[in-house]
Amino acid sequence: VPELEAVFSAMEQCYNRITGSNDAKIQYNIGTKEIDVAYTDAQGMRMRIPLNQLSDGYKSTISLVADIAYRMAVLNPQCLGEVCKKTDGIILIDEVDLHLHPAWQKQILHDLTEIFPNVQFVVSTHAPEVINSVAREQVVVLENYQALPAPAETYGKDANGILRAIMRVKERPDDIMEKFEQFYHAIDAQEYTLAAEILGNLDEILGDDPDLTAMHIQLDLEQM
């Protein structure tokens, strides 16, 4: 059935992309009456598992791709196996990052546009890893019922930079930010003993942290 082949092909491409595999095959298991995915694992063994045993992230992404491919196949049966490549359109996806590991969030938009190259995707997200995978011109910030352009470049920016510049969210909890402010106030007031106490407290809470390393250096320099 051409429609089913198109759906299975899209699912296979999706599985290959999110797992790094290159030979996934989606198959119907007559015995269990379930859909399985067969692939070669890192040890070279051929594996076969039911799709419903995959993680939520895998299942939600593959199900999304399968749903899009199925709708394309039904609407454009004349395209046969090329339906995913030839069908154009606009698709809206709410919370595209839902259930996805951060590593997948970074590539989900790229993967969707590779599998469906003639589709324009309009997605919502709260994940910095999704936002920093596209250029500033492709981002619209919704704030107080207004659609605003991204206030800064997004592509390639680190997650903390996205939180600060685009989402306007502090990258640390308020109580930690307050301790940072107390440290710098103590430095400004030349209360170095107090600054050292605050910094020691932050060391206990945060452990190895590049910002704390810089603060230790600053405190040492101030006391010279």
Task: Please place each PLM-identified region on the residue numbering.
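RecA-like P-loop NTPase motor core
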Residues: 110, 114, 129-224
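Conserved H-loop
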Residues: 125-126
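Conserved D-loop-proximal element of ABC-family nucleotide-binding domains
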Residues: 98-102, 106, 133
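Loop/turn-to-beta-strand initiation segments
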Residues: 87-89, 117-122
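Walker B catalytic acidic pair
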Residues: 94-95
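Extended helical coiled-coil dimerization/tether regions that scaffold
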Residues: 1-86
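Conserved Walker B catalytic segment
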Residues: 103-118
